[in-house]
Regions:
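Short loop/turn segments that flank or connect secondary-structure elements
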Residues: 2-46, 50-171
Length: 171
């Protein structure tokens, strides 16, 4: 059902910004439907220490909403972005404040599509000193992320993307 809806959104004849927004709305509906089965709760910030890759348009929106200075990144191939982004794995998101997302209502798609299927949020810890640095089990986020990526690659193939901490370095 959602996959068909996403396919229609990706291929509909409307503005790119409108289609991106529709994918976000679908992602939020999926998250709401899954909520009773998830370990994710307010104050849990384990996923906020993962390598979080976002598009430049998402970074621009965060900069506009927060007033934070955004660093412009060049377009880079996927393999380069992945290697560079991994440098931030285990580090807190620049928008994490007191274990709360300070941009929750406007968070990027990747943040909306990662939900832990663990019994407890504590089991999601990626702290290697605790012997738990494996990503938590989750439903396949590609169900939401791949159509979004396809949409962006089709209409804005050279849009820069990278780790959220690359766009917003430092305090």
């Amino acid at each position: 059902y959602k996959r068909q809806e996403l396919s229609l959104v990706v291929n509909e004849n409307s503005a790119l910004k409108s289609r991106r927004r529709k994918v976000i709305v679908i992602a939020d509906r999926v998250g709401a439907a899954l909520a009773p089965h998830l370990a994710c709760k307010p104050g849990c910030s384990h996923c906020c220490h993962m390598s979080t890759m976002i598009y430049e348009h998402e970074a621009i929106r965060l900069a506009e909403l927060t007033g934070r200075r955004m660093k412009r990144l060049p377009f880079r191939p996927l393999d380069v972005v992945a290697v560079e982004g991994r440098k931030f794995d285990g580090k807190p998101c620049p928008f994490l404040v007191d274990n709360q997302c300070s941009v929750y209502a406007d968070r990027p798609l990747v943040c909306r599509s990662h939900h832990s299927l663990r019994d407890s949020a504590e089991l999601c810890s990626m702290d290697p000193t605790l012997g738990n640095h494996v990503r938590p089990p989750m439903y396949d986020p590609d169900l939401l992320e791949v159509p979004y990526i396809e949409l962006n690659e089709k209409y804005h193939p050279l849009e820069p993307w990278g780790n959220i901490a690359e766009f917003f370095p430092g305090p």
